Amino acid sequence: LCDAWAQGDARIRVIHKKNGGLSDARNVGLDAASGAYISFVDSDDYIAENFIETLYDLLHEYHTDISAVHWKLVYADAPEVPAPLSSRNVTLFQGADAIRELFTENTYACYAWNKLCKRELFDTIRFPVGRIMEDLGIAHKILFDAGQIVYSDEPLYYYYQRDGSILHTDC
């Protein structure tokens, strides 16, 4: 399926790689990336139709290095998609403020998947391979290096919860 899409659209590139885990896959993607921005979507999650557009618009409207949106937990037995917000609240952070928020309120969160980042933030940073919650291993570095971050409370990322996922398996 992916190969067929890539044949029909020059913007799509497929990378075939032996499974090395989530961090390894993200790092391969970072190494191959040529665009100005990076965003991640985990394999069992899904996003709103306007996810990337909203993140891009926020990043440019507020002149930030990172834009982020809220997420909604979605369960296998009730995969509802939330109705769009009639209005959204937007918060701006400086890098150190975002780190403080990350480790206290956790509104912003350390996840890689609800954000759009300028690619250069990843120039010297890669995800630690073989770790669960690898996002936390680099979140503080990315947030610190970011000049300014914009966060919207609009839930546009759907974090799928299932029994067999990485975070729901016994270690």
Where are these regions (language model features)?
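Nucleotide-sugar donor-binding/catalytic module of glycosyltransferases
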Residues: 1-171
